[in-house]
């Protein structure tokens, strides 16, 4: 208060004022850092909302649909994993007539009249070559029973399958019994959908969890930094004393090391001087003995 009355402030007062000014500057810097971290947090929150909008717009799941069962087709040439279009074309070419031609009767009648005899003839030849003629009638009767239980080919369903192959996406094709009988399941699309590559955009729930983790880490780092800085400002004198004691201990250690080095150097020099005087004494003794 002396400078308010017109007198010059003392040195201690000037040092105190300078110290408080430094503290105020550090506090302002800490406030600016915290404000910058808050800005980063708000920006990340806005980006999170934007990612949520992208997820809902482009990575939405299709509406739940029922599985469409395609009739089993005894094609014999379609293997699991082949293209659906090729499969439908193959089935259509095998069962339906070529353009401009018509079968007489239904597919079932053509099967009974045309393909059945050829198949039975080939079956008899293969059976006779492999197993002989015995028990052929028993095997033939068993084959008849299995043939009655197997489903017939439906030409209308084949037409429907071939016409709608561009709107269907096969998701499962499993074999039952042998490779000649295939079950094909497909999903009918309910609307246009656009899917991003897998792993490029994560779901909203996972993205929120990751941003929450980032927020927690940033908040903890800012809290620890601010706490340490405020503690340093409050306990400045104590910290300075600790640092001064460290420096004093280091100076004492260096001084003691220097003194020890000087003592060793002095002792070595004394030994050298003592050794240099010995030849002079011997020379004097020889002179005295000869005289």
UniProtKB/Swiss-Prot annotation:
The lineage of its organism: Eukaryota, Fungi, Dikarya, Ascomycota, Pezizomycotina. It comes from the Eukaryota. Involved in osmoadaptation. This is Uncharacterized protein AN2204. One of its GO terms (biological process) is cellular response to osmotic stress. The chain crosses the membrane at residues 213-233. It is a single-pass membrane protein. Induction: Down-regulated when grown with elevated levels of potassium chloride.
